[in-house]
């Protein structure tokens, strides 16, 4: 898939994330890259056949102090190749992108892996409604 088409799917997936999460995002950009680098996979101790779909780079909201500011935006990296290879069709790809975005946005908010897993379970796998998920 070409990059503009993939970026449109990213926009579609982002639009499907509960509004309260989207509205709480500030000074963060979503960047699409082809693949995670071998160095990054090594640093994160990820070995084939496992791979990385996304990565949050920045300072979680819970770690910011009163003087935090004048910084470059935090970044959520999405890796197009692994996401595409893991999805059979565009609808599956939008879901995979959405799950990855939710996970990385959770890191932005300073959530633990357990908290992120609960949100993923309730929203993506369990069908909880938006108000239930975002409180």
Regions found by a protein language model. Give the residues of each.
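Active-site recognition of the HExxH zinc-binding catalytic motif
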Residues: 99-108
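Metalloprotease/metallohydrolase-associated module, dominated by Zn2+-dependent proteases
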Residues: 1-95, 108-135
């Amino acid at each position: 898939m070409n990059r503009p088409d993939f970026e449109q799917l990213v926009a579609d997936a982002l639009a499907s994330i509960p509004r309260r999460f989207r509205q709480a995002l500030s000074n963060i950009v979503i960047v699409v890259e082809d693949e995670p680098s071998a160095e990054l996979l090594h640093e994160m101790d990820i070995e084939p056949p496992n791979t990385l779909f996304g990565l949050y780079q920045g300072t979680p909201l819970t770690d910011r102090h009163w003087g935090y500011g004048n910084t470059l935006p935090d970044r959520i990296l999405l890796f197009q190749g692994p996401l595409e290879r893991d999805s059979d069709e565009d609808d599956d790809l939008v879901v995979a992108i959405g799950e990855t975005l939710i996970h990385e946005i959770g890191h932005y908010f300073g959530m633990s892996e357990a908290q992120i897993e609960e949100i993923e379970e309730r929203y993506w796998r369990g069908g909880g409604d938006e108000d239930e998920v975002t409180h």
